[in-house]
């Protein structure tokens, strides 16, 4: 590899490395979208009287007393356990079942709960009426959304609540459908007066100091954001920001809360209403409100609730762009298609070997086989350059500190012996898209979450003992030792020592699955290089240029 080309490669790798470190240390903060003030009828119009207009039918369901004690009902579904509360007739908790869906909380492991609310917030799937229907001005702190409801029917697979939403009588029935991570919700509104909207609320809370991650650094497991699919666009709402409500254009296909490898969302039978992100009542709290039109004081809704892992095939099965709940991030999004391809290959391999770590190792071997013709030619070029090292040493002695003349002479030597100095760059450049795609898969694919390999408990997290990054750094050093060294001694030392050390630092906190891939790839490169060197030892060195 020529000196200039080595500098180009080194500059490229260092630039990527510095960008990775910068994003890990200083995560990118997404700028808030331009506020879109929703119509006054939906959010900010002064409240209308709660009593029905003259001549309107009286409500069929009396409101429970405001100080009614809370009652809860638990429904066991396929892969989850949902607890529903009489406060708003809503979802109080939804815990995923199984050892895979656990997280560390202080000194113990607990099941992952997909409900994240704080004091003063409504619960997920509660309802809030617009002022025209007797509701509050501020939907994020609407006390009516937490108003007590009555349990009027309950069995092992369903529960029905009755109560009031503004001046409407409301009946809500939750049913376990038998599908993984799915509930059905039927809503019947009646007995009101006038027209307005009723919001189906999906709130979330996250401590304001929670880091969001950066382009190359994934968010923590408990990083949550309200999310909505309106029209053909999926938008996420930054809870750390402050500002006015943000209304999305287009009818709503689904809305809910995004939690890294998981999503909890409500999906109407067909696109309806509008979606508005509303902040409050405290910092770090907010919600997605799906405003559904109610004409003549009555409306029926049939909703599907999915709360579970972001399995690509499962989300695609719902249609409505639900697979866009998987957020590949800014840079990783560019490699999303490639990442999905790698995931399908790894799933196929894991089905055979029953271990995701071994599947990553086999993926590394497969990629090496696919790229073998190109890497073989590249290593041939590197070996030819190695044979020219004695001639390069003579040129260094001849030209001394005159780097310009020495570099020109080296390039002429390469041209004379038809050696491509760029050949040594090829293996790394070809692998870089695979690295980024694998990183995207590790950061977004729930299949790999909490999957162990050897001493690592989770391939999506960094190696807790830093064994793999150090081993990867050592293998990078060996690879550099086997590579032809630049004519420039200072540059040779940088390539030999600084590059492996810097690369090791970069890899300390990236997912262990990616470090495993690069380490195994380095080992295969070393073995291939050694075999080729042994095979070509008997070949005569090219004649020296004169």
From Swiss-Prot:
Gene Ontology annotations for the cellular component aspect, listed alphabetically: plasma membrane
CDD domains cross-referenced by the UniProt entry: 5TM_YidC_Alb3, EcYidC-like_peri
Bias (Low complexity) ranges: 39-60
Database matches in InterPro entries: Membr_insert_YidC, Membr_insert_YidC_N, YidC/ALB3/OXA1/COX18, YidC/Oxa/ALB_C, YidC_ALB_C, YidC_periplasmic_sf
Gene Ontology terms describing biological process: protein insertion into membrane; protein transport
UniProt keywords, alphabetically: Cell inner membrane, Cell membrane, Chaperone, Membrane, Protein transport, Transmembrane, Transmembrane helix, Transport
Subunit and partners: Interacts with the Sec translocase complex via SecD. Specifically interacts with transmembrane segments of nascent integral membrane proteins during membrane integration.
The protein's name in its UniProt record: Membrane protein insertase YidC
Organism lineage string: Bacteria, Pseudomonadati, Myxococcota, Myxococcia, Myxococcales
């Amino acid at each position: 590899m020529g000196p200039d080309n080595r500098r180009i490669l080194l500059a490229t790798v260092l630039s990527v490395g510095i960008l990775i470190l910068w994003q890990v240390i200083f995560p990118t903060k997404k700028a808030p979208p331009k506020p879109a003030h929703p119509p006054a009828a939906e959010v900010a119009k002064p409240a209308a009287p709660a009593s029905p207009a003259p001549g309107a039918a009286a409500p069929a369901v009396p409101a429970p007393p405001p100080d009614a004690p809370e009652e809860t009902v638990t429904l066991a579904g396929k892969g989850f356990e949902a607890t529903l509360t009489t406060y708003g007739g809503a979802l109080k908790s939804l815990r995923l079942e199984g050892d895979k869906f656990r997280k560390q909380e202080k000194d113990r492991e607990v099941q992952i709960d997909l409900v994240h609310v704080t004091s003063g917030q409504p619960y997920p799937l509660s309802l809030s009426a617009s002022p025209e229907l007797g509701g509050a001005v501020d939907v994020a702190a609407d006390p009516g959304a937490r108003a007590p409801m009555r349990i009027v029917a309950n069995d092992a697979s369903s529960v029905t609540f009755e109560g009031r939403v503004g001046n409407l009588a409301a009946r809500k029935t939750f049913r376990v459908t038998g599908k993984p991570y799915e509930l059905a919700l039927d809503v019947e509104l009646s007995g009101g007066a006038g027209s307005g909207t009723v919001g189906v609320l999906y709130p979330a809370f996250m401590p304001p100091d929670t880091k969001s991650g950066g382009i190359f650094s994934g968010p923590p497991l408990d990083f949550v954001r309200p999310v909505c699919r309106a029209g053909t666009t999926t938008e996420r709402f930054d809870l750390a920001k402050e500002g006015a409500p943000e209304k999305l254009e287009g009818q709503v296909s689904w809305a809910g809360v995004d939690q890294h490898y998981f999503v909890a969302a409500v999906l109407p039978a067909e696109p309806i209403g509008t979606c508005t992100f509303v902040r409050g009542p405290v910092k770090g709290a907010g919600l997605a409100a799906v405003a559904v039109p109610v004409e003549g004081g009555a409306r029926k809704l049939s909703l599907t609730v999915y709360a579970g892992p972001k399995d690509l095939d499962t989300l695609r099965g719902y249609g409505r762009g639900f697979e866009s709940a998987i957020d590949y991030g800014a840079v990783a999004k560019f490699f999303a298609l490639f990442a999905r391809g790698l995931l399908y290959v790894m799933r196929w391999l894991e089905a055979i070997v029953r271990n995701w770590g071994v599947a990553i190792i086999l993926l590394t071997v497969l990629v090496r086989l696919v790229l073998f013709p190109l890497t073989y030619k590249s290593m041939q070029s590197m070996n030819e350059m190695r044979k020219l090292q004695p001639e390069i040493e003579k040129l260094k002695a001849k030209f001394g500190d005159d780097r310009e003349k020495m570099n020109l002479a080296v390039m002429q030597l390469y041209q004379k012996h038809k050696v491509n100095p760029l050949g040594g760059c090829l293996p790394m450049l070809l692998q870089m898209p695979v690295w980024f795609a694998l990183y995207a898969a590790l950061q977004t694919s729930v299949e790999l979450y909490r999957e162990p390999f050897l001493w690592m408990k989770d391939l999506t997290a960094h190696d807790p003992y830093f064994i793999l990054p150090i081993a990867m750094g050592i293998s990078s050093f060996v690879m550099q030792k086997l590579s032809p060294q630049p004519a420039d001694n200072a540059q040779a030392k940088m390539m030999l020592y600084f590059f492996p050390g810097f690369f090791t630092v970069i890899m300390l906190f990236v997912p262990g699955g990616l470090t495993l891939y690069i380490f195994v790839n380095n080992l295969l490169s070393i073995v291939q290089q050694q075999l080729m060197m042994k095979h070509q030892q008997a070949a005569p060195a090219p004649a020296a240029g004169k």
